[in-house]
Amino acid sequence: MSAIVDIIAREILDSRGNPTVEADVLLESGVMGRAAVPSGASTGSREAIELRDGDAARYLGKGVLQAVENVNTEISETLIGLDAEEQAFIDRTLIELDGTENKSRLGANATLAVSMAIAKAAAEEAGLPLYRYFGGSGPMAMPVPMMNVINGGAHANNSLDIQECMIMPVSMTSFREALRCGAEIFHHLKKLTDKKGYPTTVGDEGGFAPNVGGTEEALNMIQDAIAAAGYEPGRDVLLALDCAASEFYKDGQYVLAGEGLTLSSEGFADYLATLADRFPIVSIEDGMAENDWAGWKTLTDKLGRRLQLVGDDLFVTNTRILEQGIDQGVANSILIKINQIGTLSETFAAVEMAKRAGYTAVISHRSGETEDSTIADIAVGLNAMQIKTGSLSRSDRISKYNQLLRIEEDLGDTVSYPGRRAFYNLRVR
């Protein structure tokens, strides 16, 4: 038995300078696991609740001392003495202890920090890499990265309505080569951005945030950077978008202020279809607002056979909502964000449900990150085959890529890089 003997939480800072929760879990053997929780900027209304203090005199109200206190008292007192290897039981205990549907009493930032730290301690106790502890001894695949190279929307202070324009290297035979491809494109994009007279400062997720004329200009710049780096758009590298459409959905209309357009759900679906016809786009995330289920159905019927349609704000890593989407034929993929639901067990259940339904699952960071790289191990351990963890700058993003490099080295010839096979439910061009 790997008995838990102590749990200690503290307030640390995330990549935006906002407080978040970090937890240490100590086992009887002396082994310790440590985990830190991320935080989002554009959030779904049905996400598990991130408990903030609301004291304007500290961190503009964003302090997490109450969440830390909840870990150091009630959670710690409940879990000390339990076996760290009983992850599912521990997570159920956390859920029952909180007693609310959205973890609003203890805070999902409190429960997740503990859930993750316990898993890390148990993996260390078992002498296993974290990805093996999650996934067992079977064959594993490295994830294809979604690399956010141009930021807009809530992640940048510019006129681009679409929140993220991303690249996905698919023709490579290893993650290492895919990462090199992405880095080379990123550096060529910086040169092109500078040449056009745009600032080369970066947004929350490490991508550039130029004040471009619209989505098409952003995508053309990315295609030019791909070509300048010696790769072929559509063959070596595919494109992906995160619309974060809930952010510009107003009174039943999609208001693209940067484009000067106001569109119905059908009109916005047509707009996205036109982009997909003009550019080698393979994936669109949150292409409709989270509450526009009719719009989501329209989009899925129109594009769901040829594009990955990812529900982020739509599903919020929640199996109950995902099940509704599966039943209604809405979207064909789910974005997995561990802090949207608040425990590892619930996160893993969402991935499993998606796979059983033929949906893909994309493991994701948040715009407010830390140096914690657990999502890299989750992506490999669960054979998710896709990861979204930002651009090729900022150490809070690079830490995940570097962990994936270590995992690939550790697995050697036994691991594959799926490339286009990551989109197993599509007719990928």
UniProtKB/Swiss-Prot annotation:
Binds a second Mg(2+) ion via substrate during catalysis. Its EC number is 4.2.1.11. CDD domains: enolase (cd03313). (2R)-2-phosphoglycerate binds at residues 163, 337, 366-367, 388. It catalyses: (2R)-2-phosphoglycerate = phosphoenolpyruvate + H2O. It is found in: Cytoplasm; Secreted; Cell surface. One of its GO terms (biological process) is glycolytic process. The active site is at residues 205, 337. It holds the Pfam family Enolase_C. It is an enzyme of class 4 (lyase). NCBIfam families: eno. Belongs to the enolase family. This is Enolase. It comes from Aromatoleum aromaticum (strain DSM 19018 / LMG 30748 / EbN1). The gene is eno.
